[in-house]
């Protein structure tokens, strides 16, 4: 397990004892990520029973660059672009971290799955009101360009988009305001990004959203994907412990 200020609850098969494991690895972090090391934004686990590394991410929400901030027309107090710059630093560092993590997993014969809240919508299909959102944090051109830069058929694949290539959404986040959930005026900012072989093993996937706004517990909904893991094990030539 590797993390930045996060822990994992683990339990051995047949054992009722639950243990909290924490293992911070910050020495090898990209310079831009060191300021985030205590915020619990990332955890990574090598599964014992599958040749698979699973990571969970909570990427900073960010904000608008200073030149787009308009006092009196913002819900948050103008900050001159500080939150925007902080997010951009994270993006630069995390891109390098992903490259290193992919290479390490591949060297060990493991597939890689990175899941979580990326706080970036990649394409027009990922935002219901994309025309009016192009100057909004999470859908800025530079954020979308960054997201595209970490994807390729040979590195990481957006699994849900691969399963639903021409569909609006499926959205994973809706504002609490304006009846956005009932009208499905949402954003797709939560992802499964998988190594190519694992992505090909995905057989179904989408958003597990509540039936009504009254049932919501969060402004996000889980993104759920079913993978045919035996197919991955067979294609890699690896065998799971058994």
Write out the residue ranges for each language-model feature.
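Amphipathic alpha-helical interface surfaces
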Residues: 90, 94, 114, 143-146, ...
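Catalytic metal-binding/acid-base residues of hydrolase active sites
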Residues: 58-60, 119-121, 164-165
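Structured beta-strand-rich core segments of catalytic domains in phosphoester-bond hydrolases
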Residues: 1-67
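Metal-dependent phosphoester-hydrolase catalytic domains
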Residues: 18-30, 123-242
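A structure-centric signal for secondary-structure junctions around beta-strands
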Residues: 3-4, 39, 51, 109, ...
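Catalytic-core regions built around general acid/base machinery
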Residues: 93-104, 146-150
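Active-site beta-strand/loop signature of hydrolases that rely on acidic residues for catalysis
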Residues: 54, 97-124, 159, 193, ...
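Surface-exposed cleft-lining segments at the edges of enzyme active sites
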Residues: 25-35, 59-95, 131-136
